[in-house]
């Protein structure tokens, strides 16, 4: 298997982008990535695009053909990848495997979602849950994650203040990200006193409905220096995936994402490092409780200790003796354009590890040169992990 490198990244702003169409968004992100990578359209061997539900959100299926056409890249093969909110990272994983296998040399991995054109986005998103045993009975993702939060609070003594601090830190980081949907600060009191959604979660514990797109250019590591300076090349040391039950009630423990534990353990093994070597992480905080759970499941602290870690501010950008988590603002504040999220997470790590000017105001301390991203589909039925390094 060949080593795989990232040589370019581009994204749109995330938010309610009324004037931009579905096709406008992915073309903008793709063009930015191609320019950043210093490649031509003719260099692209294939494209993999993550999209959860173009059919429900904008009435458009067969998006692979649409994107190749509107990007001006026909007849380059383009494949749409779907795994709920993990669609983007699985598109990247497909791209990584195609390059590592030697089948392709230069590949575009992208993600896109246009969520604000549908009347009831919550119902559309619920299609990623178990339709017979969850959605049929009225369960939505806010209610499912609320059950996870309530159980975690009961089992480990997590306080509402500790849970809410996650959102406070996320918004603080997002003020330094020009692409973020919610680039404003908030307070503990504002988070706790926001409109209730599903007890114990308020609106400010939840990620928003977002439009947006993101794209990465990956290539054979031996070819990377043909396009990018050596100090601007970031290497994908591991791309792993694991599955779990789609329905929350079938899990042995709803306070952990077993697929995240399995996928991250595989990633650490492939990269031959321990969790302590990670400098920066982007985790899937679709709801604040999931951020805390992933901090534990990725091995950054013991089970039940995440609340204390968050309350002490250890995940903050300016805290040197712990992994920096979600410097972008995460899904909570940067936005969650479903199919684009997994790519955006890895794009943030790409910027962070090469200490790019794009993240100069939110730059994490890079000591060991490693970053990890965990992208979750549903309530953890699918998890994809990417581990990056600034060293080959």
Curated annotation (Swiss-Prot):
Enzyme class: transferase
Binding site for CoA: 206-207, 209, 332
Entry annotated with the keyword Acetylation: no
Protein family: Belongs to the thiolase-like superfamily. Thiolase family.
EC number, as in UniProt: 2.3.1.9
Keyword Protease: no
Protein name: Acetyl-CoA acetyltransferase
GO molecular function: acetyl-CoA C-acetyltransferase activity
PANTHER family in the record: ACETYL-COA C-ACETYLTRANSFERASE, ACETYL-COA C-ACYLTRANSFERASE
Superkingdom classification of source: Archaea
Residues of the active site: 85, 336
InterPro entries per UniProt: Thiolase, Thiolase-like, Thiolase_C_2, Thiolase_N
GO biological process: isoprenoid biosynthetic process
Originating organism: Methanothermococcus thermolithotrophicus (Methanococcus thermolithotrophicus)
Alphabetic keyword roster: Acyltransferase, Isoprene biosynthesis, Transferase
Reaction catalysis annotation: 2 acetyl-CoA = acetoacetyl-CoA + CoA
Pathway: Metabolic intermediate biosynthesis; (R)-mevalonate biosynthesis; (R)-mevalonate from acetyl-CoA: step 1/3
Record's subunit section: Interacts with HMG-CoA synthase (HMGCS) that catalyzes the second step in the pathway and with a DUF35 protein. The acetoacetyl-CoA thiolase/HMG-CoA synthase complex channels the intermediate via a fused CoA-binding site, which allows for efficient coupling of the endergonic thiolase reaction with the exergonic HMGCS reaction.
Its biological purpose: Catalyzes the condensation of two acetyl-coA molecules into acetoacetyl-CoA. Functions in the mevalonate (MVA) pathway leading to isopentenyl diphosphate (IPP), a key precursor for the biosynthesis of isoprenoid compounds that are building blocks of archaeal membrane lipids.
């Amino acid at each position: 298997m060949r080593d795989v490198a990232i040589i370019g990244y581009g994204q749109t702003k995330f938010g309610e982008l009324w004037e931009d169409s579905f096709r406008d968004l992915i073309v903008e992100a793709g063009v930015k990535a191609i320019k950043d990578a210093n490649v031509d359209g003719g260099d692209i061997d294939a494209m993999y695009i993550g999209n959860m539900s173009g059919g429900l959100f904008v009435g458009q299926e067969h998006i692979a053909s649409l994107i190749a056409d509107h990007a001006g890249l026909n007849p380059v093969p383009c494949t749409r990848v779907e795994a709920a909110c993990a669609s983007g990272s699985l598109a990247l994983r497909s791209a990584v495997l195609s390059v590592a296998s030697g089948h392709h040399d230069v590949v575009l991995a992208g993600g896109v979602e246009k969520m604000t054109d549908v009347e009831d986005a919550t119902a559309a998103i619920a299609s990623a849950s178990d339709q017979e045993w969850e959605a049929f009975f009225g369960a939505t993702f806010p209610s499912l994650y609320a059950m996870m939060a309530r159980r975690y609070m009961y089992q480990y003594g997590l306080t509402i203040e500790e849970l809410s601090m996650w959102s406070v830190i996320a918004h603080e980081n997002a003020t330094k990200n020009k692409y973020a949907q919610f680039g404003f600060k908030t307070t503990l009191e504002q988070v706790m006193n926001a409109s209730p959604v599903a007890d114990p979660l308020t609106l400010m514990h939840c990620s928003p409905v977002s439009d947006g797109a993101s794209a990465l250019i990956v290539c054979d590591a031996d070819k990377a220096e043909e396009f990018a300076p050596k100090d601007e090349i970031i290497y994908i040391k591991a791309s792993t995936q694991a599955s779990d039950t789609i329905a929350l009630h079938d899990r042995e423990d709803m306070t952990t994402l077993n697929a995240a534990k399995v996928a991250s353990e595989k990633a650490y093994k492939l990269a031959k490092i321990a969790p302590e070597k990670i400098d920066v992480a982007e985790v899937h905080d679709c709801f604040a409780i999931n951020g805390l759970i992933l901090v534990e499941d990725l091995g950054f602290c013991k089970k039940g200790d995440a609340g204390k870690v968050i309350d002490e501010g250890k995940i903050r950008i300016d805290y040197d003796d712990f992994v920096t988590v979600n410097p972008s603002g995460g899904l909570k504040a940067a936005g969650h354009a479903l199919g684009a999220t997994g790519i955006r997470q890895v794009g943030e790590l790409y910027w962070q590890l090469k200490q790019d000017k794009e993240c100069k105001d939110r730059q994490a301390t890079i000591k060991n040169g490693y970053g990890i991203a965990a992208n979750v589909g549903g309530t953890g039925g699918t998890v994809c992990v990417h581990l990056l390094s600034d060293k080959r």
